[in-house]
Structures are given as C-alpha cells and as structure tokens.
Amino acid sequence: MEISLVPMENGSAMTLRGGGEAGASCVQSPRGECGCPPTAGLNNQSKETSPRRRATHEDAGQGGRPLPPMPQELPQPRRPSAEDEEGEGDPGLGTVEEDQAPQDSGSLHHQRVLINISGLRFETQLGTLAQFPNTLLGDPVKRLRYFDPLRNEYFFDRNRPSFDGILYYYQSGGRLRRPVNVSLDVFADEIRFYQLGDEAMERFREDEGFIKEEEKPLPRNEFQRQVWLIFEYPESSGSARAIAIVSVLVILISIITFCLETLPEFRDERELLRHPPVPPQPPAPAPGANGSGSGVLSSGPTVAPLLPRTLADPFFIVETTCVIWFTFELLVRFFACPSKAEFSRNIMNIIDIVAIFPYFITLGTELAEQQPGGGGQNGQQAMSLAILRVIRLVRVFRIFKLSRHSKGLQILGKTLQASMRELGLLIFFLFIGVILFSSAVYFAEADNQGSHFSSIPDAFWWAVVTMTTVGYGDMRPITVGGKIVGSLCAIAGVLTIALPVPVIVSNFNYFYHRETDHEEQAALKEEQGIQRRESGLDTGGQRKVSCSKASFCKTGGPLESTDSIRRGSCPLEKCHLKAKSNVDLRRSLYALCLDTSRETDL
C-alpha cells in the first residue's frame, strides 16, 4: 500500500492511496467548501467509517508507512464568486457532484428535515416542502437564514399552533386550514411570514367568509387621477375633504329648501309672486262719448309677466345655485372617471342625474308658460302642474347623495344589498299572511251590518297594519270571530318579521366591523410608516459603521426578519450573530470532512 500527499490545482488536499483503491479524501472545492455528504438540516442515519478507510488505517497500523503529518493550517475559504452563487443550491444541504446527481436526487427528495417552531419540533421531507418552491420553506435560499448548524435544524420564533395549518398546506398540496385555536389575524400574519402567496391568502379569506374587496381603478392620466381622487375619495387629501364638506353643505341646503317651500306662509308668498293680483280696470266710456263710437278697451283680465316674478323668488335662486353645483360636480366626475360605461351604470351617479333633472324640466315648463298663448287652456295648465308636482317630488332623492360622504349610509346600503334574499323572503311571508288573514276577517265579519270590511281587497290594509304591529285603528274587527282572527294575525306578523331580522343584523355587524378594522389598519400602517422613516434616519449611520467592521455584515444585512422591520427597528447584534452562524457552518463542514468528532480540533 502506498500513501502519498498529492497537491491539487485549486488548493492543497490530502489523498490516501492503498491496495490500488482510492481512500478517503478531503478536497477543497473552489468555493471554499468541503465536498462532503449533504447533511445540513437533515435527520440522517449515524455515519459509519467506510470499508476503504478502515482498511487504510489497519494497513497503516500493521507495519505500513506512517501517515504523513496533518497540515498546520487549513486554507482559508474564499468568498464565493458571482458565477458560483448563480448555480448554488441549498447551502444547508451540501453539494452533490454532477455524476452523482441522478442517483442522489431521489434520496434528497425523501430526506427528512427538522423544523423547530419556538421549541416545538416538526419533521417532514424535503420533497414535501419542494412542492411550493416560491415559499419560505420551499426555497432553499430563503430558509437558509433560519438554519442552526449546531442543532442541525431550522428554527423559527413564530406561533406554534399556527404551524399545524402551514405544514398541512405543504402536505395536502395547497389546502389551507386554520386551526380552531388560532385567531384569524394571527394565522393571516403567519401566511404572510411563510410567503405562501396572494392566492393562498385569497382562498383563506374566502373560506373564512370574507368578501373579496373590489379593486378601485384609477385613471391613467395624472391630471384626471388627481381630479378623480379629489371628487370621489374624500379621505385622500385635504382638498378632497374641503370639496366633500362643500358638497354636503349644498345637499343639506337643497333639502332644507325643498321642505321649507311647502310651508303655508311661504307657499302663499310664492303664489303672489307667480300670480299677482290684477288691478281693477277703469269703467268703459259711454257709447258715443268724445265723438267716438262704442269700443271695448279690454277683452278680459291681463296676466302679469311671470319670468321676472319667478326669478325674484328666493327659493328659486337657492335652488338654481344648488343645481349649478350639482351639475358642475357631475360633469367634472364624468370627465375624470376611469370608465365612462361603469360611471353610467353606477346607481349613485344615476341618483345624481335624477336629482338635477327636475329643475331643468320645471324651468322649461315655466319658460314655456311665458310665451304668448302658453297658458291659455286650463286643462293643459292642470296637467302641467300635476307633472311638475311629480317631478319636484323626485328632488327628495338628493338625500341619497349624502351616502357618498357617509360611511354609515354606505354600510346600510351594503347591508341591504347583502340581505336581499332575506328581505325577499320577508315580503313573501307577509304577502301570504295578508291574503290569509284578510280573507278570514272578511268572512268572520260578513254577517255584521257595521263591519268595516266591505271586501277582501279592502281588508288588505288592515292585515298589513296588524302584521307589522302598527295598528292605526281606522279598521277593526267587531265580532268575536273577527277578534280571534285579528289576534292570530298579530302573532303571525311578529313571528314573520322576527325570523329574518337576525340575519340582517348579522350582515350589518359584519360590514360595520370590517369598515372599522380597515380604518384601524390604515391608521396602523400610517404609524408604522412614520416609525420606519424615523428609525431609518436614526440608525442609518450606525448600520453603516457596524457593516464596515463585520466581515459577514453584507451577508447578514439584508436578512433582517420581517418582524423587526415591521416594528421599525433592526438590532445591531444581528449582523454579528449571523456572521458567527456562517463561521460555525463552515467549521462543521470541515470537521465532518476530516471525520473528527470535535470541532475544537480545527
């Protein structure tokens, strides 16, 4: 047997040769790593000395040549180059030679890995984690920062009960289930920490009953985007809040004016302005007087011009001012909207159009009356007044414009929209009850001469009022049978209305708490952003100094945990701890290559 020390091109290495077979060797790789079996993070079987190595030692002990002395110093590992880093796999799993890759790929797939979650250890296979390579546990580079070489495991200081659901996500191939003893916000934080992705988060929210938030598109043009934010989102800026305040004041003034103009004293003044009294006509001169023949000075009472009188009405002036603002706001929002089709289909925009439409019809009708012969026929005037009353009634819908600036009205609208099925059931149950009890009370009161129910349709009103527990008292049963029917009608109405009400209340609570949670999260994000900016200004200089002194600070610098970033602080000790972890990793690899049980021998 012959033993010799053979120098290598890329670094010194010791090779034992005996009996024509190559013995154990320790070769320094170009990257400064030892070419050894993949062991980091794996729960492998205990190592046994290879037969070749045992034979070599036995031959050396039986009188062969003594082993050459160990080198005094091991060559220092150099930093990996950019080309090596591109093809580098999981450093915690060692390296695999190209000719051994096909044979070892299957074994690596079934290798076991230990994961320590705040002291609770989980054991799984690499193939299970590799199903989702974009996640924290599935990506070898991402999970390396949490590897502990001394314990040969990955350590995460996270919530332990939540990891049952996280590990089940890998084992089940993508099914995410929240443990019953973990709250929603905690499990959502764990999903974000382990980087399971937006798709997993959306599925989790849908399974938990969350309604998907609709994305709000913005115009592409910068000017249109700014205008759209000012008029559509009052919370976006200070100018948007000012515009919202002006809009709310105009809406309130319009509604107050709509109500005050119906008071008797104001209505009488408006009638005087619209139709002032005609002064008495002088008597006609006698026939033949002043040498003139008989003539008629006037054919009837004259009507004063209406246009100046109408424009002098203060209610008309206030209404015109409000409509000018509403029209300006509608046109600006239509100009800046991201989609004209979506804008036209929006129910709130339809309400805005309906709110200003009656004014122009009323103004056109009054201007038409000023034309000669415009108001000659009384029948046409009566028809015009009836149409104007109906059109003016539409102005009351302006109150719904407040929902654009009120979160409470928006929550109420979303609640009614989500409870349409329950409201439909309520109306259907009331319809059945009205038919049954109106028919019953009619036949129960049919023989009584003083009955208030002349027909079944006439009893519909009584049934509706009784089932809704209002009871005006204008129609009431008199006989004993009619009173029994009325009692049953009232009881049935209470039960019918009470059944769908809890569902509607539950929907209201859901939307209310969701809105308050969004406001709290927005405030929290704003505070965190301020703290992050302040901490970045305070610790920027210190971080540069520490990185210049620590040799491995460049590696440990970008590996700050998301928790520390979320808190807005980055302890300086983390650079030193990660540098020490990398040194321990290389020391462990050298000790394993030399088959020595003590790392201090290095």
Swiss-Prot record:
Q: Does the keyword Transmembrane helix apply?
A: yes
Q: Which residues lie within the membrane without crossing it?
A: 457-468, 469-476
Q: How does it assemble?
A: Homotetramer and heterotetramer of potassium channel proteins. Interacts with DLG1, which enhances channel currents. Forms a ternary complex with DLG1 and CAV3. Interacts with KCNAB1. Interacts with UBE2I. Interacts with XIRP2; the interaction is required for normal action potential configuration in the heart.
Q: What is its main location?
A: membrane
Q: Report biased composition (Pro residues) as residue ranges.
A: 66-78, 276-286
List the source organism. Mus musculus (Mouse)
- Name of the protein described by the UniProt record: Potassium voltage-gated channel subfamily A member 5
Family matches, as Gene3D superfamilies:
1.10.287.70, Potassium Channel Kv1.1, Chain A, Voltage-gated potassium channels. Chain C
Mark the residues modified by lipid (S-palmitoyl cysteine).
337
InterPro entries according to UniProt: BTB/POZ_dom, Ion_trans_dom, K_chnl_volt-dep_Kv, K_chnl_volt-dep_Kv1, K_chnl_volt-dep_Kv1.5, SKP1/BTB/POZ_sf, T1-type_BTB, VG_K_chnl
